[in-house]
Amino acid sequence: MKRRAERQKETRQRIVDATVELHRSIGPLRTTISAIAEKAGVERHTYYAHFPELKDLYQACSGHYVVHHPPPDHCSWTELADHEDRLRRALSEVYAYYGHHEEIFANVLRDAQVDALCAKFTNPVFQNWKRTWSDAVAEGWDAEGERDEALLAAIGFALDFQTWNTLVRQQGLDQERAMELMVGMVRCLMRT
């Protein structure tokens, strides 16, 4: 009985791994059940035995990916007293993370724009990261009311995957120049 449970767990993990790889390479919307089953080396009925609904698969894949590819830890950023240094470190770590996971992030965010189920599992993760990171970077900055709102918006914009993608991939800036552009934007905001 124990061996059977282990085999089921291994099969389930192969399905999750196959799905994550397909989401990375082609995106959730282009990933078919047949492709997942083939890549995992299982039959379709085996896939459905483990994941009767697509939401079950998305939940397993999201949890698996975040555990094995954790986002940058914002706690060390608050140790930096200088606000620009704090923002610079955050951008450095977040942009490196985006660069490393660019393919899967671009695919899932693209598909989340047109698929409600994909959005349900993707958007809260990215929104939570951005909110947590923005709060950590903004901590201690002298801003209240509308100015604080603008500061959080600017930092959130700077830390957004689409901003990184636009600056680095579409505009051709290297990560250092993209970071300095965002630091300069926030600096200008805080001087007004």
Show where each model-derived region lies.
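Short, basic, alpha-helical segments at the C-terminal edge of helix-turn-helix-like DNA-binding modules
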Residues: 33, 62-70
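Alpha-helical DNA-contacting segments of helix-turn-helix folds
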Residues: 23, 56-65, 125
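Key DNA-contact positions within bacterial/archaeal DNA-binding proteins
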Residues: 45
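Basic, helix-initiating cap at the start of DNA-binding domains
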Residues: 1-42, 55-56
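Amphipathic alpha-helical packing segments from all-alpha helical-bundle domains
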Residues: 92, 96-109, 116-142, 149-153, ...
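Hydrophobic alpha-helical connector segments
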Residues: 60, 73-103, 126
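Amphipathic C-terminal alpha-helical segment
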Residues: 135, 152-173, 188-192
